[in-house]
Amino acid sequence: MAYPFQLGLQDATSPIMEELMNFHDHTLMIVFLISSLVLYIISLMLTTKLTHTSTMDAQEVETIWTILPAVILILIALPSLRILYMMDEINNPVLTVKTMGHQWYWSYEYTDYEDLCFDSYMIPTNDLKPGELRLLEVDNRVVLPMELPIRMLISSEDVLHSWAVPSLGLKTDAIPGRLNQATVTSNRPGLFYGQCSEICGSNHSFMPIVLEMVPLKNFENWSTSMI
Protein backbone atom coordinates (compact mmCIF):
# COMPACT_ATOMS: atom_id res chain seq x y z
CA MET A 1 0.00 0.00 0.00
CA ALA A 2 1.00 3.64 -0.31
CA TYR A 3 2.57 5.64 2.53
CA PRO A 4 2.55 9.38 3.30
CA PHE A 5 5.14 11.35 1.28
CA GLN A 6 5.95 8.27 -0.80
CA LEU A 7 7.78 9.22 -4.01
CA GLY A 8 8.14 5.84 -5.72
CA LEU A 9 5.77 3.09 -6.77
CA GLN A 10 4.16 0.71 -4.31
CA ASP A 11 6.02 -2.52 -3.55
CA ALA A 12 5.46 -5.09 -6.28
CA THR A 13 3.38 -8.08 -5.19
CA SER A 14 2.82 -9.80 -8.54
CA PRO A 15 5.04 -10.82 -11.47
CA ILE A 16 3.27 -8.28 -13.70
CA MET A 17 3.96 -5.43 -11.29
CA GLU A 18 7.62 -6.45 -11.09
CA GLU A 19 7.82 -6.28 -14.88
CA LEU A 20 6.10 -2.88 -14.89
CA MET A 21 8.57 -1.51 -12.34
CA ASN A 22 11.51 -2.78 -14.40
CA PHE A 23 9.99 -1.17 -17.50
CA HIS A 24 9.50 2.08 -15.57
CA ASP A 25 13.19 2.12 -14.59
CA HIS A 26 14.23 1.22 -18.15
CA THR A 27 12.16 4.04 -19.67
CA LEU A 28 13.20 6.53 -17.00
CA MET A 29 16.87 5.87 -17.75
CA ILE A 30 16.29 6.50 -21.47
CA VAL A 31 14.47 9.76 -20.68
CA PHE A 32 17.30 10.80 -18.35
CA LEU A 33 19.94 10.18 -21.04
CA ILE A 34 17.95 12.10 -23.67
CA SER A 35 17.38 15.01 -21.28
CA SER A 36 21.08 15.11 -20.39
CA LEU A 37 22.04 15.19 -24.07
CA VAL A 38 19.59 18.01 -24.81
CA LEU A 39 20.79 20.07 -21.84
CA TYR A 40 24.40 19.51 -22.90
CA ILE A 41 23.67 20.74 -26.43
CA ILE A 42 21.80 23.77 -25.09
CA SER A 43 24.71 24.63 -22.79
CA LEU A 44 27.12 24.39 -25.75
CA MET A 45 24.91 26.70 -27.80
CA LEU A 46 24.84 29.25 -24.99
CA THR A 47 28.58 29.19 -24.25
CA THR A 48 30.19 28.55 -27.64
CA LYS A 49 30.59 31.00 -30.49
CA LEU A 50 28.34 30.06 -33.40
CA THR A 51 30.17 28.54 -36.38
CA HIS A 52 29.18 27.08 -39.74
CA THR A 53 26.23 29.46 -39.98
CA SER A 54 26.18 29.13 -43.75
CA THR A 55 25.89 25.33 -43.82
CA MET A 56 22.73 24.33 -45.69
CA ASP A 57 22.73 20.56 -45.15
CA ALA A 58 24.66 17.82 -43.37
CA GLN A 59 23.85 14.30 -44.49
CA GLU A 60 25.70 12.60 -41.63
CA VAL A 61 23.88 14.59 -38.94
CA GLU A 62 20.49 14.10 -40.60
CA THR A 63 21.10 10.36 -40.85
CA ILE A 64 22.04 10.15 -37.17
CA TRP A 65 19.05 12.12 -35.90
CA THR A 66 16.72 9.98 -38.02
CA ILE A 67 18.10 6.57 -37.05
CA LEU A 68 18.83 7.28 -33.36
CA PRO A 69 15.23 8.26 -32.40
CA ALA A 70 13.93 5.19 -34.27
CA VAL A 71 16.28 2.94 -32.27
CA ILE A 72 15.23 4.59 -29.01
CA LEU A 73 11.53 4.11 -29.82
CA ILE A 74 12.17 0.42 -30.57
CA LEU A 75 13.99 0.02 -27.24
CA ILE A 76 10.90 1.41 -25.50
CA ALA A 77 8.27 -0.36 -27.62
CA LEU A 78 9.56 -3.94 -27.46
CA PRO A 79 9.52 -4.31 -23.63
CA SER A 80 6.16 -2.52 -23.54
CA LEU A 81 4.59 -4.92 -26.06
CA ARG A 82 6.00 -7.89 -24.16
CA ILE A 83 4.33 -6.75 -20.93
CA LEU A 84 1.04 -6.06 -22.74
CA TYR A 85 0.97 -9.63 -24.04
CA MET A 86 1.84 -10.96 -20.58
CA MET A 87 -1.07 -9.03 -19.05
CA ASP A 88 -3.52 -10.51 -21.57
CA GLU A 89 -2.30 -14.08 -21.14
CA ILE A 90 -4.32 -16.29 -18.78
CA ASN A 91 -3.13 -19.89 -18.39
CA ASN A 92 -5.34 -22.37 -16.54
CA PRO A 93 -6.80 -20.14 -13.81
CA VAL A 94 -7.68 -22.05 -10.66
CA LEU A 95 -10.50 -19.66 -9.79
CA THR A 96 -12.77 -17.16 -11.54
CA VAL A 97 -14.25 -14.16 -9.75
CA LYS A 98 -16.80 -11.89 -11.40
CA THR A 99 -16.64 -8.25 -10.31
CA MET A 100 -19.45 -5.78 -10.97
CA GLY A 101 -19.16 -2.06 -10.41
CA HIS A 102 -22.13 -0.12 -9.02
CA GLN A 103 -22.71 3.44 -7.88
CA TRP A 104 -20.93 3.27 -5.45
CA TYR A 105 -19.80 -0.17 -4.36
CA TRP A 106 -18.45 -3.41 -5.79
CA SER A 107 -20.12 -6.81 -5.92
CA TYR A 108 -18.24 -10.10 -6.26
CA GLU A 109 -19.30 -13.56 -7.39
CA TYR A 110 -17.11 -16.65 -7.14
CA THR A 111 -18.37 -18.48 -10.20
CA ASP A 112 -16.76 -21.81 -9.23
CA TYR A 113 -18.89 -21.95 -6.08
CA GLU A 114 -22.63 -22.04 -5.71
CA ASP A 115 -24.14 -19.02 -3.93
CA LEU A 116 -20.79 -17.49 -2.99
CA CYS A 117 -21.34 -13.81 -3.73
CA PHE A 118 -21.47 -10.58 -1.75
CA ASP A 119 -21.41 -6.79 -1.97
CA SER A 120 -18.43 -4.79 -0.73
CA TYR A 121 -19.10 -1.33 0.72
CA MET A 122 -16.69 1.18 2.19
CA ILE A 123 -16.75 1.37 5.99
CA PRO A 124 -17.73 4.92 7.04
CA THR A 125 -15.09 6.91 8.88
CA ASN A 126 -17.14 6.97 12.09
CA ASP A 127 -17.27 3.15 12.17
CA LEU A 128 -13.55 2.52 11.70
CA LYS A 129 -11.65 0.60 14.37
CA PRO A 130 -8.22 1.76 15.62
CA GLY A 131 -5.58 1.06 13.00
CA GLU A 132 -7.99 0.82 10.08
CA LEU A 133 -7.47 3.04 7.05
CA ARG A 134 -9.79 5.89 6.16
CA LEU A 135 -11.58 5.53 2.80
CA LEU A 136 -9.89 2.16 2.17
CA GLU A 137 -11.57 -0.36 4.46
CA VAL A 138 -14.57 -2.43 3.33
CA ASP A 139 -17.13 -4.57 5.12
CA ASN A 140 -16.45 -7.63 2.92
CA ARG A 141 -12.93 -8.29 1.66
CA VAL A 142 -12.16 -10.31 -1.46
CA VAL A 143 -10.35 -13.39 -0.15
CA LEU A 144 -8.16 -15.14 -2.74
CA PRO A 145 -5.48 -17.85 -2.67
CA MET A 146 -1.91 -16.64 -3.08
CA GLU A 147 0.64 -17.90 -5.64
CA LEU A 148 -2.09 -19.14 -7.97
CA PRO A 149 -3.48 -17.59 -11.19
CA ILE A 150 -6.97 -16.16 -10.70
CA ARG A 151 -9.15 -14.77 -13.46
CA MET A 152 -11.13 -11.63 -12.71
CA LEU A 153 -14.12 -10.89 -14.95
CA ILE A 154 -14.94 -7.20 -14.62
CA SER A 155 -18.02 -5.29 -15.77
CA SER A 156 -20.41 -2.58 -14.58
CA GLU A 157 -24.08 -2.40 -13.74
CA ASP A 158 -24.53 1.32 -14.45
CA VAL A 159 -21.72 3.73 -15.46
CA LEU A 160 -18.01 3.42 -16.24
CA HIS A 161 -15.84 2.25 -13.35
CA SER A 162 -12.27 0.98 -13.16
CA TRP A 163 -11.08 -1.84 -10.90
CA ALA A 164 -7.50 -1.07 -9.83
CA VAL A 165 -5.04 -2.51 -7.30
CA PRO A 166 -1.67 -0.74 -7.82
CA SER A 167 0.61 -3.14 -5.91
CA LEU A 168 -0.61 -6.01 -8.11
CA GLY A 169 -0.24 -4.02 -11.32
CA LEU A 170 -3.98 -4.21 -12.02
CA LYS A 171 -6.22 -1.63 -13.64
CA THR A 172 -9.14 -2.83 -15.74
CA ASP A 173 -12.11 -0.77 -16.91
CA ALA A 174 -15.59 -1.86 -15.83
CA ILE A 175 -17.84 -1.04 -18.79
CA PRO A 176 -21.62 -1.65 -18.93
CA GLY A 177 -22.43 -4.39 -21.42
CA ARG A 178 -18.80 -5.47 -21.79
CA LEU A 179 -16.90 -8.16 -19.88
CA ASN A 180 -13.18 -7.46 -19.41
CA GLN A 181 -10.77 -9.85 -17.77
CA ALA A 182 -7.53 -9.64 -15.83
CA THR A 183 -5.19 -12.05 -14.10
CA VAL A 184 -4.47 -11.79 -10.37
CA THR A 185 -1.40 -13.52 -8.95
CA SER A 186 0.15 -12.61 -5.62
CA ASN A 187 3.63 -13.65 -4.51
CA ARG A 188 2.91 -13.22 -0.82
CA PRO A 189 -0.01 -13.08 1.64
CA GLY A 190 -1.44 -9.83 2.94
CA LEU A 191 -3.98 -7.08 2.41
CA PHE A 192 -3.80 -5.14 -0.83
CA TYR A 193 -5.79 -1.97 -1.33
CA GLY A 194 -7.16 -0.29 -4.42
CA GLN A 195 -9.87 2.12 -5.47
CA CYS A 196 -12.15 2.86 -8.38
CA SER A 197 -9.97 4.68 -10.90
CA GLU A 198 -12.62 6.10 -13.21
CA ILE A 199 -14.69 9.13 -12.18
CA CYS A 200 -18.16 7.64 -11.79
CA GLY A 201 -20.20 10.19 -9.87
CA SER A 202 -20.38 12.06 -6.59
CA ASN A 203 -19.19 9.12 -4.44
CA HIS A 204 -16.43 7.98 -6.77
CA SER A 205 -13.87 8.36 -3.98
CA PHE A 206 -15.80 5.96 -1.74
CA MET A 207 -15.37 2.73 -3.75
CA PRO A 208 -12.33 1.01 -2.20
CA ILE A 209 -11.11 -2.47 -3.07
CA VAL A 210 -9.49 -4.78 -0.53
CA LEU A 211 -7.92 -8.09 -1.57
CA GLU A 212 -6.90 -10.51 1.17
CA MET A 213 -4.40 -12.99 -0.21
CA VAL A 214 -4.09 -16.12 1.94
CA PRO A 215 -2.60 -19.63 1.63
CA LEU A 216 -4.76 -22.11 -0.26
CA LYS A 217 -5.77 -24.02 2.90
CA ASN A 218 -7.03 -20.82 4.54
CA PHE A 219 -8.96 -19.93 1.40
CA GLU A 220 -10.66 -23.33 1.38
CA ASN A 221 -11.68 -22.88 5.02
CA TRP A 222 -13.03 -19.38 4.28
CA SER A 223 -15.00 -20.48 1.22
CA THR A 224 -16.52 -23.38 3.17
CA SER A 225 -17.65 -21.03 5.94
CA MET A 226 -19.20 -18.62 3.42
CA ILE A 227 -21.32 -21.18 1.57
Swiss-Prot record:
It catalyses: 4 Fe(II)-[cytochrome c] + O2 + 8 H(+)(in) = 4 Fe(III)-[cytochrome c] + 2 H2O + 4 H(+)(out). InterPro entries: CcO_II, CcO_II-like_C, CcO_II_C, Copper_CuA, Cupredoxin, Cyt_c_oxidase_su2, Cyt_c_oxidase_su2_TM_dom, Cyt_c_oxidase_su2_TM_sf. It is a multi-pass membrane protein. Binds a dinuclear copper A center per subunit. Residues 1-14, 88-227 are mitochondrial intermembrane. Mg(2+) binds at residue 198. Its cofactor is Cu cation. Cu cation A2 binds at residues 196, 198, 200, 204. Keywords: Copper, Electron transport, Magnesium, Membrane, Metal-binding, Mitochondrion, Mitochondrion inner membrane, Respiratory chain, Translocase, Transmembrane, Transmembrane helix, Transport. One of its GO terms (cellular component) is respiratory chain complex IV. It is found in: Mitochondrion inner membrane. Pfam families: COX2 (PF00116), COX2_TM (PF02790). PROSITE patterns: COX2, COX2_CUA, COX2_TM. Residues 46-59 are mitochondrial matrix. Cu cation A1 binds at residues 161, 196, 200, 207. Its EC number is 7.1.1.9. It comes from the Eukaryota. Belongs to the cytochrome c oxidase subunit 2 family. Component of the cytochrome c oxidase, the last enzyme in the mitochondrial electron transport chain which drives oxidative phosphorylation. The respiratory chain contains 3 multisubunit complexes succinate dehydrogenase (complex II, CII), ubiquinol-cytochrome c oxidoreductase (cytochrome b-c1 complex, complex III, CIII) and cytochrome c oxidase (complex IV, CIV), that cooperate to transfer electrons derived from NADH and succinate to molecular oxygen, creating an electrochemical gradient over the inner membrane that drives transmembrane transport and the ATP synthase. This is Cytochrome c oxidase subunit 2. The gene is MT-CO2.
